[in-house]
Amino acid sequence: MMNAHFAGVGDNADNAAYEHGIQVIDEDKMFNGNVSTYLNIEKVIPAGFNYHLISVFGSQSTGKSTLLNHLFGTQFGVMSEQERRQTTKGIWMSKNKRESGGSSMAENILVMDVEGTDGRERGEDQDFERKSALFALATSEVLIVNIWEHQVGLYQGANMGLLKTVFEVNLQLFVKDSQSTPRSLLFFVIRDHLGTTPLKNLQNTLVQDLSKLWSTISKPAGLENSRIEDYFDFAFVALPHKILQPEKFDEAVTQLSTRFKEGYNDPRKSGLIDEATAPIFLPQYHRRIPADGFSAYAEGVWDQIVNNKDLDLPTQQELLAQFRCDEISREVQVAFDETITPLEDKQAEDARAGTHSLIPDLGPKMNAARQKVLKDFDVNASRYHKGVYKRKQAELEGKVDTRLKALFQKQLTAAHKSGIEGFTEAVSAAVKNGQKKNASYDFAQIVDSEKKKALTKFEEDATAMAIEGAAWSSHENELKIYKKELDDVSGRLRKEEMRRLATRIERWVRTRLDESIGLEFNKLGSGRGGSGAPEHGDRPPTEKDLWDRVWTIFTDTVKMAEKRFTDRASSFDASADEVEVGLWRLRRKSWGVLRAKIDEEVMEGNILLKLRENFEDKFRYDDLGVPRIWRPTDDIDGLYTKARESTITVIPLLAHFKLAKTSKPPPLDAWIGEAPASVSPADEEDLSPIGGVDDDEDKTLEDEMTILSDGKQADLLVRFKKTADGVYVEAKRGAIGGLSQIPFWLYPAMLALGWNEIVAVLRNPIYFIFLILLAVAAYVTYTLNLWGPIMRVANAASQQGLEVGKERLRAFLENSDAGRQAMAMSGSGDSNSTRRYEDVKMDRLNGDGKKSKSMEEDLDDI
């Protein structure tokens, strides 16, 4: 009958379906994924290593299933006595159910019934036979070879060809040394033994056949001299005929069942178990696969066999261990994730927000999570393959430590950055507080105090987050980096403070130079103390040594600024190089301030005003500084020429920054000096290039000292001459205006003759108010200089009114009889005159209200 109450491949069965066992592999070579479910139902999984696996191998219809059912009380399907056909398809498994076994049999014996070989159903297709036999040999501790007595000595009948293939493939795929390969027991059960041929003789025949078979198989390199006894032990038993001698058969089977118990390895034995009561299960036969991993192990073995992959049994053990260890690792990491993931999310959120907050109690949380996950893994995975367990333990520890290390490093980085930020803010706040109090604070002392606080805080935070037993949680290297960055930040803050100091001193220099240099240039506008033009005497001090005074004022001011800078920098604990760079920058910046001030003073409007003032002081005042009252007898032309030429010579003087003592530009390059060796690009990025000082500039020192270019000088000269000419014309008018004065006696005469009219106007309010309004209007008109335009407009309007009146009169005369007669009596000249003006428009009048010259020329042409 077929197997009943067995869970087949793909069945989604309940517990009742597993009553008698499970189909491990079906006839289509599909592995049943519910094997672990069956083992769990049979309570084999909790046994760990305390289980044993037996397989049966033999030809079809030789009673393999019957033998197993009698030995172990299983319910494997057996062949019907009315027909001889295949009964077992695929590979089936059942747990030992022999009730009479008692304590004489080992616990948790698993029995696999393998499809028989040489069946007519599969015919010449021996692929499944080879694979199922190899699977049974690879997974089982004991392989029962079921053989009839009359098959002993036969090649095909005893399945020697199939055994040869299995041995050959098994040897090629096994580990290449016998010491590391688990041994297996080939248990030959000789059926239907009549007793005519002693069991000993049958045993010798089988051993000889197997040894001969072993010598003919292909062996891997290094195993050419290996023997079959190096890999297999043999046991033999003979059973009476089941049909002809049923009582003896049952008795022999019962006696045989008592041998399926655990024994030990007797060193006196060497591959042959010939005692009738010797235990079958020896320690060296066990594959050392935990029961909870057997399903995955068997499935991996079968998968490699089916796909013709290499079959390395120790590797399969490792694969099982890898599978289970990976599974256990995933399970124990669930609780680890519950603790660590929120911490990682918090750090990620802080990173996105750009903040550097410290997570409270991070160190204790990480320590507790790490210890728990490693302990849970050790408890559940330590019974598997030691090498794999150790490797997976290291991998798990590596994964855990990778995540914890990331947390630790980010927390340490947060402590680092927050400490740096806190240090910077504390120093800046202390400096600002000192500035508010207007006190002379000690910057170096502030930095030293805040640095000690920052280091103490960092070490406390780093110690609190350390992981026990993790070498990577040391913060010594980070502490060194932190100290170095504190030093760098201190240096940067010191540089910034020195920059601010330099900026304050630069403002002081700018203020002093604005006042002093502006005063020197203002002296150019006064020429009253001079002694005449250069050709008649020396230039005034205000003009001759202008640049000498400017240079002296500049260098003295910068010298005082340098002293201020040096004295203040001493409280910053600045190095000599930093002070040197600061002074070098101060000199360059100060020169830029002076150059900007000079450019401001010589701007077109400013310098032209100063030249005019200089000219007017020389022209309108005498040598004693007394203002001149121009008379017709004065030599206005000579004084004008003298003053103008004297002022003109100031322009070339201003054009170039040259010292009067040397007639050369001041030694600006030597005064600024070479750039210090410690200067950095950041120190130079805000500095303007200086000609003659910077080698990479096209300008020379002469170009740097050029204040006015030739083009500007020429333009300035033209503008000044126009201004001077205006002053000259005004002086001429003043001198001539004195000749046409109104006689003094005329004023009393006008007052006497007009007294009555004056009194009438003053007594009449209307006239008086009207007079006041006229006076105000006249004053406003005079102030706005509108008398000229008003006169021209009035003249033009009167002329245009006259022309319009003439046109109206002419039109009237042309429309009346008397007028036409009068016009007829007039001469032709009058008509020509009429035509001459009839087309005159107001927009063709000139400023005096008369026809423009172009209009008159047009009329003449006509």
UniProtKB/Swiss-Prot annotation:
Residues 763-765 are lumenal. Residues 48-298 form the GB1/RHD3-type G domain. GO terms for molecular function: GTP binding; GTPase activity. Its EC number is 3.6.5.-. Residues 473-499 form a coiled coil. Residues 833-856 have a biased composition (Basic and acidic residues). It is a multi-pass membrane protein. GO terms for cellular component: endoplasmic reticulum membrane. It is found in: Endoplasmic reticulum membrane. It holds the Pfam family Sey1_3HB. Residues 524-543, 821-862 are annotated as: Disordered. The chain crosses the membrane at residues 742-762, 766-786. Residues 1-741, 787-862 are cytoplasmic. Keywords: Coiled coil, Endoplasmic reticulum, GTP-binding, Hydrolase, Membrane, Nucleotide-binding, Transmembrane, Transmembrane helix. Cooperates with the reticulon proteins and tubule-shaping DP1 family proteins to generate and maintain the structure of the tubular endoplasmic reticulum network. Has GTPase activity, which is required for its function in ER organization. PANTHER family: PROTEIN SEY1. Belongs to the TRAFAC class dynamin-like GTPase superfamily. GB1/RHD3 GTPase family. RHD3 subfamily. This is Protein sey1. It comes from Pyrenophora tritici-repentis (strain Pt-1C-BFP) (Wheat tan spot fungus). The gene is sey1.
